[in-house]
């Protein structure tokens, strides 16, 4: 490993630790800090999108992108409005999404042979996707109970769909990352793209099936 690669790995790891600590801390602290967290994420996401290069004529106009993250972030704020405040459902959601990302990488890196959507995200494979879904299901089982195993699988699949949507948007604009706010990780939407479809569906399913 070269010195540059080592430094990049250390930077990525430190950024990841700080990122996870801040997000989990804000969610766990109170309903107000949870709402503030997602409001800040929304503002940063909008800033990244509006600073991005213009896409082809068939791309979505930038003003329309203003609405894109609203359902996901509003769902996480709404879930924090329970009285008394209970951060566990939101934390469980975060762990499922992160487990999906980790499982997809751990399985896809050595075993990924069949590409999921090479034109949009060449690094993603069917094997990695299944590994991510399995990891998310395992976290749902551990955090919420065996009866929620299916929910983890659904969140894993929807997280991947959000990731692919963001990748397609970046590719049409010839962008590698959505920004550079998080050293070693890219922009804010590179970390939260998995929430786009998963968070609203999670909130709806939780409302229907949670005791």
Model-derived features with residue positions:
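Hydrophobic transmembrane alpha-helices of multi-pass small-molecule transporters
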Residues: 136-137, 194, 198, 207
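Juxtamembrane interface at the ends
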Residues: 105, 166-175
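Juxtamembrane boundary at the C-terminal end of a transmembrane helix
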Residues: 203-211
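Re-entrant/interfacial helical elements at transmembrane boundaries that shape
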Residues: 109-110, 170-173, 196, 201
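Membrane-embedded alpha-helical bundles of polytopic integral membrane proteins
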Residues: 1-157
